[in-house]
Design a protein with these regions (language model features):
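Acidic, surface-exposed loops and disordered segments
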Residues: 2-241
Length: 241
């Protein structure tokens, strides 16, 4: 299996695309069909969720066959329909929770895309239904991610230029440009793209979040950092503060 193929293909799962192809294909989808997730797809997602929770100390939970969270007024205002499965993105109440949720949550999102599923990050357009998830006293929910087979594949949106979000130039490495281009295709809150990547000497990269009245910039930063890693190749650089 090529290195850039997701490693979470199980016996009965045929991986449909590489992570790079998933980045190109992924668009936020808010309307879903009633097609259920197969046992193999669920098992693959749960394997990734277990890995993410162990690696980051998160408490991500996959909720299946539960439509009530997306039947509230806010969900209708957000144009969600047919949502029966979703991810509860939860973790300990720490300063870096949002960034960890973004970074590791996007790993699940791109895996889902390779499995033929569609997703959408959801900040407020849902309701928390009692007894559908479990939280410890020191944990909180950062957001939800809707999940399922889309009624459509979503649409692309206008994105910023490379120059607006990085210091890429004729003298920066190609991998840096590849990383920035991958980051530009990442989902961010209301498509705000409030981030900046700076290449510094020694193949080090600084990722910064901007200021936004909308919020969610720390979560967005985690999402775009993962996209950057996929595009650039983690072996080519190190993150710097």
């Amino acid at each position: 299996m090529p290195e850039n193929l997701t490693k979470f293909a199980l016996v009965n799962i045929q991986v449909q695309m590489t992570l790079q192809e998933a980045i190109q294909a992924r668009h936020s989808v808010r309307a879903y069909t009633d097609k259920p997730l197969s046992e193999d797809v669920v098992a693959t997602l749960k394997a990734k969720i277990n890995e993410v929770n162990a690696a980051a100390g998160l408490h991500v939970q996959l909720i299946l066959d539960e439509p009530k969270s997306f039947q509230c007024a806010m969900a209708k205002y957000g144009h969600f329909s047919g949502v029966n499965s979703y991810l509860v993105m939860a973790g300990k109440k720490t300063d870096d929770l949002d960034e960890k949720v973004g970074y590791y949550g996007e790993q699940i999102v791109l895996l889902a895309q390779t499995l033929g599923l569609n997703t959408c990050w959801v900040g407020v357009s849902y309701s928390k239904i009692p007894d559908t998830y479990v939280l410890e006293d020191d944990e909180k929910i950062a957001c939800y991610i809707s999940l399922g087979y889309g009624a459509n594949q979503g649409v692309s949106h206008k994105i910023k230029s490379v120059k607006e979000v990085s210091n890429a130039s004729d003298v920066t490495p190609k991998w840096f440009l590849d990383g920035v281009n991958a980051a530009l295709l990442a989902p961010t809150a209301v498509n705000q793209q409030k981030f900046f990547f700076e290449y510094i000497t020694g193949n080090k990269v600084i990722a910064k979040r901007g200021v936004s009245l909308v919020g969610y910039t720390q979560m967005d930063l985690g999402i775009v950092k993962y996209h950057f890693e996929v595009g650039a190749g983690k072996e080519n650089f190190e993150w710097a503060e």
